Amino acid sequence: MKHRRKLFLTKDIYNLPPTDQVFIKAMKDNIAFHTKNCPEYKEILDGFGFKLCDLNSVEDLWKIPPTPTSYLKNKTLLSKPYDKLLIRTTSSGTGGKKTLSGYDKSSALCALSMALKVLRFHKLISLMRTNYIILGVKPDKNNQTATAKALTYFTILAPAKKIEYAVKIVNSEYQVDVDSLIKAVVKFGQEGRPVRIIGFPAYFKLFLTELIARGIKLNLHKNSKVLLGGGWKTFFAEEISKEELFAMANETLGISRQNFKDHFSTAEHPVNYVACENNHFHVPAFSRVILRDVNTLKPVENGVPGVLNLITPILSSAPYGSIITDDIAVLRDNCGCGIASPYIDIIGRVGLSNIRTCTQQASEFLKNL
């Protein structure tokens, strides 16, 4: 997959037009590989009447039948044996269903190259020894979720002195150890080293609320950072705006606004989307994003809400080149931060009862091309 290698060597990561041709070639290579190595995926594409010759430019990417993430939680699609993958993951399994995924060596190298470029651009790489608060559980043989691995993965961005996990395993059960967490952050503050807090926004809010309840106010090192991602999920009733959360944290921890970063990625689409200074998720050169009409699945124009379709050739381990989520979003231009590419504004979720099955919806959509 030489075109994929070339794409993931891109240095100007938010300048999309110069990469359009290599992106479409990489996607064609990706689809050809998966149809050869994943019979179930080939059957899906054949059933929808899709042919590689349909792809001639990035404007044709919408013709690729998008696979719903909900479908992948019920059906495993892999192009290489799961137990042979270099890195094996599952999705977080909200609702009790999980997606099996992972990286072979070539996919992992592409992911590493991409991550270093994106995270360096957003000034998240440092050589300073740093203490970490991970608002999650440490990955082990019993916990292979992409979320757990991603939280720990972010600790390589600055050399770790100490890592404190919020969730501990006690008698084979997960328990939140609030006292240890509070003691750790107070100790970290006294040490005078940078502190990085990583996790879900809901967990971060609960952490801040506990600090406030105990009357604890800190002024952490000026290079301390907060990296959040994953949304509020089952804690939607607790949701507050990002600006409220940032203000709450600044008051409690003394971390400046520019050191808060929101991050977006999924097990099925492992591309790094990191928020800009205006807190927007810009599309990097390693992916393309389409918003689709919820009823017809046809693409809508920028500025019009639609179901989020994420496209990337990063994985040769699984045929997840074009996946459709249950998120409703808008693709917008002209952020004002200086980044040229459009950005994703996620505004809500579609209930599963409102989404027809992959085969029914996609086949109807393709028949009308």
Feature-to-residue mapping (PLM):
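Active-site glycine/GP-rich loop and adjacent strand/helix microenvironment
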Residues: 1-14, 21-32, 155-369
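Active-site diphosphate/adenylate-binding microenvironment
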Residues: 17-21, 32, 36-88, 98-103, ...
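Short coil/loop linkers at secondary-structure junctions
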Residues: 49-51, 125, 217, 255-256
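Generic beta-strand structural signal
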Residues: 87, 128-133, 193-195
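Conserved catalytic-core segments centered on acid/base and nucleophilic motifs
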Residues: 89-92, 101, 207, 265
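Conserved adenylate-forming
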Residues: 92-147
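Short, amphipathic alpha-helical segments
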Residues: 105-109, 113, 126, 141-148, ...
